Curated annotation (Swiss-Prot):
Subunit annotation: Forms heterodimers with TAS1R3.
Lineage of producing organism: Eukaryota, Metazoa, Chordata, Craniata, Vertebrata
GO MF term list: G protein-coupled receptor activity; sweet taste receptor activity
Positions on the Extracellular side per record topology: 20-561, 619-630, 698-722, 777-779
Gene symbol of the encoding locus: TAS1R2
Organism in which the protein naturally occurs: Saimiri sciureus (Common squirrel monkey)
Classification via Gene3D superfamilies: 3.40.50.2300, GPCR, family 3, nine cysteines domain
Record CDD domains: 7tmC_TAS1R2
Function as written in the Swiss-Prot or TrEMBL entry: Putative taste receptor. TAS1R2/TAS1R3 recognizes diverse natural and synthetic sweeteners.
Pfam families assigned: 7tm_3 (PF00003), ANF_receptor (PF01094), NCD3G (PF07562)
Protein name: Taste receptor type 1 member 2
Localization: Cell membrane
Chain segments annotated as transmembrane: 562-582, 598-618, 631-651, 677-697, 723-743, 756-776, 780-800
Cytoplasmic side: 583-597, 652-676, 744-755, 801-834
Length: 834
């Protein structure tokens, strides 16, 4: 025998044994088609099933659960409203049969009763396609554990089951529960609404309390998975003990509650999320009141978010602010009056089963009627819409028109197919089932109020599952000093530009450290590390972005630039005047003794060098860098080489010609002075090319060591080494020129240039060494100014120091600029030597 057949045989036996009549027509309404209803009118949290005695639990022995009766009345109201509506199921009367399931204790017997036929028989068949059970569909029950138990039976027969408040995500599995649908959003939407609420108020440090049943464990796990690696951390999670109604609390349970509340007191988390049925929480909150734990924010799951009995607990308002996640309020016209209507008198229904009585339900409802009326219809609407979903499916299946329907036998699988297709408007809300069998009703965040003139569960925000965020957020009356928003953070939020340094194992616990200058914090990329700014950007301390560094270069509006430019202009004009004077007196001995044609080469190159001075000012470019690194050094080197060669040539004429006549003849014959200058020029050009290849011509930037916000832009990234390399030849030439000039200090006065050459060469040598020294200790834009100033002074030293005295003699002592005077000076020198 197959396992399914053995199971059905056992259930058939159990059904026959447990059937029992009851006298209460409020649970039964005859009709052409019956709906089954499973509601919790009494609650037994332990869920004990007396299989040893084969007895169905007597629900009336347990405490009344007010909300269950309220939901049962909603089903009765919906059925009666449909029966009075001529447009929906015309000429068809819906009936119902409802059973109290005692929360989780009494699930098997009612579902067997609904699956049985009119004779209480559940036949064993191989094919149930043509089987017609007692009811066409089942509404309920309310919690996930009971729904799972019932669905395992009903799915075997494809009997439609619509639950109104079970949110477990496991129920979305249509392979396991093909006949189960829900008129409430799934648990993931409830969890997401909670998370969005905590994110909105920046609560990132929470405590979580869960019940020990499947509901608490599953939802606690879902919340933990949702928060894993996110911005919200769970300080601790505890499991609440499950208490037996109508019995004294066991010592271990009492101690467990005391320990949990003490842990809440000691924790810095001020937000407490509670996943638990309402009945488990009464003793817990009594312990909270006993220990005077106040100032917390309690976030209630949908199972107790609008529980009127818990709300009525004396002194509960002192414990803090209560926020709950629940279904959107949809007013149902006429339901408030129907809810408190007494049961109709009628004869005993012989086919009724057990657990169809609740003698105190109506009185309890009357005592809480004000709260129920003000709190609105939330889960009530889920029951209401579930009944209407079955009615619309039945309307389609029976082929109803405006006046009549074709009454016939309805097989469960046929009705199930039609329920999946329904899409109708009910009180301005569209009802249809998604592929997982859920209706996407909106959720609301409610705050508990204790002002009798207001709604005890005041809506403060709404959540739309399809959009995934809160909206219509209203002000909340916080139970804090000055109505300030409670703070629940392991660590305070870091200020802008501060990185997080983790402390401990929780990502929400950290230290805030300022990002140092030159770095910034990109929170979207990595909030635990400061990133370095790009080389052309900078930042101050504690910044989230970098700014462009100010480029620093020599500009025309600066006083130093203007002063140097005036000196360069003076030098240019002076050199030009010297060139004119030398040109007009070209045939004189003074000009020829100074070098003759070579003087014009030097003066021309000096003019070019003066014209290169402006390229030191302004934003460096490739062209200006080429002039600074190539044109000017070559011009200046030629000038120095001419002076050095001229000094050597004079010494040779007067001191070495007689000793080395052949060498001197070669020097004169082959224009040794010009060859030497050409050779030195070629050598200089080689060094310049090597320097350019090594450093490049593109301007580069470097950080100002005194002010990192400034980027110094220059032509040479390694300007110190480049300067030393480029000036090394010039320094050697200056030393050589100085040496030859010193050797000729005893020459005739008109040929003795030792003082002038010594001045020029010594000035160049000392200024170049000073510039290199200055560069070694300073790295700012002032280096460019000093470099330019030294360059101009060196040019002036040659222009005025070397050529100036000669112009002075030409202009003011023309009698000394004659061949006779020069010959007399040479004869006097010769006579002194002899």
């Amino acid at each position: 025998m197959e396992p399914r057949v053995r199971t059905v045989c056992f259930l058939f036996f159990l059904l026959r044994v447990l059937a029992e009549p009851a006298k209460n027509s409020d649970f039964y309404l005859p009709g052409d088609y019956l709906l089954g209803g499973l509601f919790t009118l009494h609650a037994n949290m332990k869920g004990t099933v007396h299989l040893n005695f084969l007895q169905v639990p007597m629900c009336k022995e347990y405490e009344v659960k007010l909300s269950g009766y309220n939901l049962m009345q909603a089903m009765r109201f919906a059925v009666e409203e449909i029966n009075n509506d001529s447009s929906l199921l015309p000429d068809v009367r819906l009936g119902y049969e409802m059973v109290d399931v005692c929360y989780v204790s009494n699930n098997v017997q009612p579902v067997l009763y609904f699956l049985a036929q009119e004779d209480n028989l559940l036949p064993i068949q191989e094919d149930y396609s043509n089987y017609v059970p007692r009811v066409v569909a089942v509404i309920g029950p309310e919690n996930s554990e009971s729904v799972t138990t019932v669905a395992n039976f009903l799915s075997l027969f494809l009997l439609p089951q619509i639950t109104y408040s079970a949110i477990s995500d496991q129920l979305r599995d249509k392979q396991r529960f093909p006949a189960l649908l829900r008129t409430t959003p799934s648990a993931k939407h409830h969890i997401e609404a909670m998370v969005q609420l905590m994110l909105h108020f920046r609560w990132n440090w929470i405590s979580v309390l869960v019940s020990s049943d499947t509901y608490g464990r599953d939802n606690g796990q879902l919340l933990g998975d949702r928060l894993a690696g996110g911005d919200i951390c769970i300080a601790f999670q505890e499991t609440l003990p499950t208490l037996q109604p109508n019995q004294d609390m066991m010592p271990e349970d009492r101690q467990r509650l005391v320990s949990i509340v003490e842990k809440l007191q000691q924790s810095t988390a001020r937000v407490v999320v509670v996943f638990s049925p309402d009945l488990t929480l009464y003793d817990f909150f009594r312990e909270v009141l006993r220990q005077n734990f106040t100032g917390a924010v309690w976030i209630a799951s949908e199972s107790w978010a609008i529980d009127p009995v818990l709300h009525n607990l004396t002194g509960l308002h002192r414990t803090g602010t209560f926020l709950g996640i629940t279904l959107q309020n949809v007013p149902i016209p006429g339901f408030n009056e129907f809810r408190v209507r007494g049961p109709q008198a009628g004869p005993t229904h012989q086919r009724s089963t057990c657990n169809q009585e609740c003698d105190t339900c109506l009185n309890s409802t009357l005592s809480f009627n004000t709260i129920l009326r003000l709190s609105g219809e939330r889960v009530v609407y889920s029951v209401y819409s579930a009944v209407y979903a079955v009615a619309h499916a039945l309307h389609s299946l029976l082929g109803c028109d405006h006046s009549a329907c074709t009454k016939r036998g309805v097989y469960p699988w046929q009705l199930l197919e039609e329920i999946w297709k329904v899409n109708f408007s009910l009180l301005d809300h569209q009802i249809f089932f998604d592929p997982q069998g859920d209706v996407a009703l909106h959720l609301e965040i409610v705050q508990w109020q204790w002002d009798l003139s207001q709604n005890p569960f005041q809506s403060v925000a709404s959540y739309q599952p399809l959009q995934g965020h809160l909206k219509d957020i209203q002000d909340i009356s916080w139970h804090t000093v000055n109505n300030t928003i409670p703070v629940s953070m392991c660590s305070k939020r870091c200020q802008s530009g501060q990185k997080k340094k983790p402390v401990g194992i929780h990502t929400c616990c950290f230290e805030c450290i300022d990002c140092p200058p030159g770095t910034f914090l990109n929170q979207t990329a990595n909030e635990y590390d400061c990133q370095a700014c790009p080389s052309n950007e900078w930042s101050h301390q504690s910044e989230t972005s970098c700014f462009k560094r100010r480029l620093s270069f020599l500009e025309w509006h600066e006083a130093a630039t203007i002063a140097v430019a005036l000196l360069a202009a003076l030098g240019f004009l002076s050199t030009l005047a010297i060139l004119v004077i030398f040109w007009r007196h070209f045939e004189t001995p003074m000009v020829r003794s100074a070098g003759g044609p070579m003087c014009f080469l030097m003066l021309t190159l000096l003019l070019v060098a003066y014209m290169v001075v402006p390229v030191y000012v302004g934003l460096p470019k490739v062209s200006t860098c080429l002039c600074r690194q190539a044109l000017f050094p070559v011009c200046f080197t030629i000038c120095i080489s001419c002076i050095a060669v001229r000094s050597f040539q004079i010494v040779c004429v007067f001191k070495m010609a007689s000793r080395f006549p052949r060498a001197y003849s070669y020097w004169v014959r082959y224009q040794g002075s010009y060859v030497s200058v050409a050779f030195i020029t070629a050598l200089k050009m080689v060094t310049v090319v090597i320097s350019l290849l090594a450093t490049g011509l593109n301007p580069t930037t470097r950080t100002d060591t005194d002010d990192p916000k400034i980027m110094i832009i220059s032509c040479n990234p390694n300007y110190r080494n480049s300067l030393l390399f480029n000036t090394s030849l010039d320094l050697l030439l200056s030393v050589a020129g100085f040496s030859f000039a010193y050797m000729g200090k005893e020459l005739p006065t008109n040929y003795n240039e030792a003082k002038f050459i010594t001045f020029s060469m010594t000035f160049y040598f000392t200024s170049s060494v000073s510039l290199c020294t200055f560069m070694s200790v300073y790295d700012g834009v002032l280096v460019t100014i000093v470099d330019l100033l030294v360059t101009v002074f060196n040019l002036l030293a040659i222009s005025l120091g070397y050529f100036g005295p000669k112009c002075y003699m030409i202009l003011f002592y023309p009698e000394r600029n004659t061949p006779a005077y020069f010959n007399s000076m040479i004869q006097g020198y010769t006579m002194r030597r002899d």
